[in-house]
Design a protein with these regions (language model features):
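Short, Lys/Arg-enriched N-terminal segments with co-localized hydrophobic residues
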Residues: 13-27
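A subset of signal/propeptide-processing and intrinsically disordered low-complexity segments
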Residues: 11-14, 138
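Extended, acidic-biased charged interface segments
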Residues: 165, 169-175
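Electropositive, beta-rich accessory/interaction domains or terminal extensions
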Residues: 25-155, 161-162
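Aromatic (phenylalanine/tyrosine) cluster motif
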Residues: 1-3
């Protein structure tokens, strides 16, 4: 898929009043958001002797999506990142306005700053639900969990408690 693709969501079965096959067939996917950037990175030295793939860079053309992530993307610590349940990290692009107001002049509070693969416009944690199925181009994804921010955000942004603030403000992103 490529950037600026609409994100379409098929309503969950629990939202269907009648479960008859003929009714389910008439429910059409809805455009709920837009992918503004697709970002990938390979792990590199980071902080505290660790490596990280948080410094994701924009992709300019089509990219292959697999069950475990995007082609060319990697994670530094597979115990906590990546895999089928954390294949793509999505982050609402409008959250950056909040962080820029909180921390003016910090260069990392911009698209990609949180290590997201997909910069999303038009939805956020208040509308996204676990189990939502998204169609982006020819790829289908299912929202599996919210992000659990770790210490690497504190290091990246130079703010000792930003991981806790991200959780408190409910601006974590999702997989």
């Amino acid at each position: 898929f490529v950037f600026n693709q609409p994100v379409k969501q098929k309503p969950s079965p629990s939202a269907i009043i009648s479960h008859s096959p003929s009714v389910q067939e008439t429910i059409m996917p809805q455009t709920i958001a837009t992918v503004r950037e697709i970002r990938i990175a390979q792990p590199k030295p980071f902080a505290r002797g660790q490596i990280s793939g948080i410094d994701k860079q924009p992709v300019t053309g089509p990219i292959e999506a697999t069950p475990t992530g995007l082609a060319g993307d990697g994670v530094g610590d597979p115990r906590y990142h990546g895999g089928a349940d954390k294949a793509l990290h999505c982050y609402a692009q409008h959250h950056y306005e909040h962080w820029q107001a909180q921390f003016p002049g910090n260069p990392h509070f911009r698209a990609g700053g949180f290590g997201e693969n997909l910069c999303i416009e038009g939805t956020d944690e208040w509308q996204v639900c676990l189990g939502d199925q998204w169609q982006i181009g020819s790829a289908r994804f299912e929202v599996s969990q919210g992000r659990q921010p770790c210490w690497k955000l504190n290091e990246r942004f130079g703010v000792p408690d930003i991981a806790a603030q991200v959780q408190h403000d409910l601006r974590c992103g999702w997989y």
